[in-house]
Amino acid sequence: MATKKAGGSTRNGRDSEAKRLGVKRFGGESVLAGSIIVRQRGTKFHAGSNVGMGKDHTLFATADGKVKFEVKGEKSRKYVSVVAE
């Protein structure tokens, strides 16, 4: 015989998988061409020199060098560049 009353059901208990977004290579770090620098939703960071942008807004190095983050422009946008060593 059951010693506990039947529990009701719930409509909660779900969550989406983490997408592992964010900065992958920080300022001053050396990168090779093709290295992912930032994974993002939208353009939180914009592509500077020697940096390309994928269709999902991922920023990647197009040349070997060191990563440089800078804020510039009238709208104070954050740019990511790769400076050749």
Swiss-Prot record:
Domain of life assignment: Bacteria
GO CC terms, sorted: cytosolic large ribosomal subunit
InterPro entries: Ribosomal_bL27, Ribosomal_bL27_CS
Xref: Gene3D superfamilies: 2.40.50.100
Region (Disordered): 1-20
PROSITE patterns for this protein: RIBOSOMAL_L27
Keywords tagged on the record: Ribonucleoprotein, Ribosomal protein
PANTHER family: LARGE RIBOSOMAL SUBUNIT PROTEIN BL27M (PTHR15893:SF0), RIBOSOMAL PROTEIN L27 (PTHR15893)
NCBIfam families per the UniProt record, alphabetical: L27 (TIGR00062)
Protein name, entry field: Large ribosomal subunit protein bL27
Gene that produces this protein: rpmA
